[in-house]
């Protein structure tokens, strides 16, 4: 099991395990603490390019000030090459978006359509586009749609109700080593099949740096190595229960690819509970708003 599947196992469709949410609170009674509004909330939007001959497929500006440009013919979930999409931070100078490391972007509205003028190293490209209909604004949506910085992962492993491991770390290597030692100490270690997969996943990959959700239905996971970055789709399966569906295709969201979000003390908490026979693994990821 890869580390990405530990963080969002169903989201990435890398394993066919079943997960259950840990948040059973009444959403009407759960009060979200005030949280700072992302700097570019009013500018956030995704534009899909309508020119079939263009090399560009989509341009998105996120609430937290990141631009994501997807090239035509690229599969957003494919991270084997860093030329499939271009991403970085942006700022705004009057009506011009300054794209760090790339150039400038000017957006002009014309009726129901848009014209994007992209200036890259002095070369201008005119891109006709339509604006993606955003996920409706609401308390949970607006809270979620921002960039979150990974803080820590907490893993609890139980077998027949007995706690085998209970540990937390911001380091995947540290958590992997501690989990491996716990497995070795357990008298029925041969029964911990899924736990061993988790331990190997932690040993093979680092934790991500940040996770970004946008109103346009994009989620972006950034790693230290940009080639490991993930760019896919999300939407609410049930906004009242804060149940999120994930997919490599925006039309293929299902309850099999879902996780429940919880907001506590200005943090995003994502929890998964994997149960198979006598083995239970509870994984909780804590993220803070990225400044």
Regions flagged by a language model, labelled:
Residues 17-21:
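C-terminal motif of bacterial Sec signal peptides marking the signal peptidase cleavage site
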